[in-house]
Structure formats: structure tokens, C-alpha cells
Swiss-Prot record:
Protein's UniProt keywords contain Ribonucleoprotein: yes
Family: Belongs to the universal ribosomal protein uS14 family. Zinc-binding uS14 subfamily.
Reported function: Binds 16S rRNA, required for the assembly of 30S particles and may also be responsible for determining the conformation of the 16S rRNA at the A site.
Assembly and oligomerization: Part of the 30S ribosomal subunit. Contacts proteins S3 and S10.
Protein name: Small ribosomal subunit protein uS14
Cofactor(s) annotated in UniProt: Zn(2+)
Gene3D superfamilies documented for this protein: 30s Ribosomal Protein S14, Chain N
Gene designation per UniProt: rpsZ
Positions annotated to bind Zn(2+): C24, C27, C40, C43
GO biological process, one term: translation
Amino acid sequence: MAKKSLRVKQARPQKFKVRAYNRCLRCGRPHGYMRKFGLCRICFRELAYKGELPGIVKASW
């Protein structure tokens, strides 16, 4: 419940620009956020593993 209220709170326009922060679009996690994809590291890893993110491949060298 707390996470849902924080997602709603974050979505509202902030009175001050400094208060704005990014949240994962999928799960709402505020930390480990990747701007390029709009996802947290955990959701990014899950989707990349399933092959649902185009152009993302596992590194091998």
C-alpha cells in the first residue's frame, strides 16, 4: 500500500523541481533506476533475459 501511494505522490507535479525523482515504470522501485529504459536494474535484467528488450544481448568476450 505504501508503495502505491508513493507512486501516485511522485506522479503529481512537484511544487519544487528538486523534489522530482525517477521510479521504475514496471514496479515503482526508486533506486537502481536506468534512465535510458525507465526501469530499475531488477526489471531490466528480467526483461533482458526474456528477450523483451530489443537490441539488448548478454555480454560475452
